[in-house]
Regions:
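Helix-to-loop junction immediately C-terminal to a conserved catalytic motif
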Residues: 37
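Conserved ABC ATPase signature
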Residues: 77, 116-121
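Conserved ABC transporter NBD signature motif
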Residues: 45-56, 60-61
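Catalytic Walker B motif of ABC-type/P-loop ATPase nucleotide-binding domains
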Residues: 142-146
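Conserved ABC ATPase "signature" region
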Residues: 85, 97-112
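Hydrophobic anchor residue at the start of the ABC signature
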Residues: 130, 170
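The feature captures the beta-strand-to-loop junction immediately N-terminal to the Walker
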Residues: 22-24
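Q-loop/switch helix immediately C-terminal to the Walker
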Residues: 71, 76-92
Length: 216
């Protein structure tokens, strides 16, 4: 059975904005991320990017987007290094071995670059997925579902730094997290959207309502 997730939900994230989606489990944070990526389509409202609906700019928008969801999207029969390289190629990025090594090192996988991901723990597989961010800093929009989960203290710090650099360089980062992770960007560049505040007050035919600004 479909259910109404949001009513009257709208926010704007201009370049250089860090958006945290807050709310209890089951309030629709992951669904909202999928809507923002175009993987789901709202029954009403729209998501705008550069002033146009992402349904009209699908190819350009996806070229500018890095999305890391709950599913890691890694291939078990490929090494950690090969997974990062292929993900980069799919994103039209050319990366060197040294860049891949640096990316895997940033998430604590220096000693596992040649291991197939099928040999790795679930937490390590998550880190392989997150290593993509460290070779995708030129992609303007990052949408991340619980990116800090399963990381050690140093990897959390490295990822926080990467997110901060991206925002300070004019990128947009939209993410969910249950962890308190300090991201060093000016307060005026931060936006928290509590999705539970837009939950419907009563049950109706399901629809997802989103409004957008000139960007995401």
């Amino acid at each position: 059975m479909r259910r109404l997730l949001f009513r009257g939900l709208a926010f704007e994230a201009p370049p250089g904005t860090l958006v945290r989606l807050a709310g209890a489990n089951g309030t629709g944070k992951t669904s909202l991320l999928r809507l923002l990526t175009g993987l789901m389509v709202p029954d009403a409202g729209e998501i705008l990017y550069k002033g146009e609906s992402i349904t009209k700019l699908r190819e350009d928008f996806h070229r500018d987007l890095v999305y890391i969801g709950h599913m890691n999207g890694v291939k078990d029969d490929l090494s950690a290094r090969e997974n990062v390289r292929i993900a980069a190629r799919l994103g039209n990025l050319i990366v060197t071995d040294s860049q891949i090594n640096e990316a895997l090192g940033a998430v604590g996988l220096t000693d596992f670059t040649e291991h197939t991901t099928g040999e790795l723990s679930q937490g390590q597989r998550r880190r392989v997925a997150l290593a993509r961010l460290f070779v995708s800093e030129m992609k303007p929009v990052w949408i991340l579902d619980e990116p800090f989960t399963a990381l050690d203290v140093q990897s959390v710090a490295n990822l926080s730094d990467a997110v901060a650099r991206h925002v300070r360089a004019g990128g947009i980062v939209i993410y969910t997290t249950h962890q308190e992770c300090a991201v060093d960007v000016p307060e005026e560049k931060k936006l928290t959207v509590d999705v539970s505040a837009f939950a419907p007050k009563r049950k109706k035919k399901a629809q997802a309502c989103l409004g957008g600004g000139d960007h995401v």
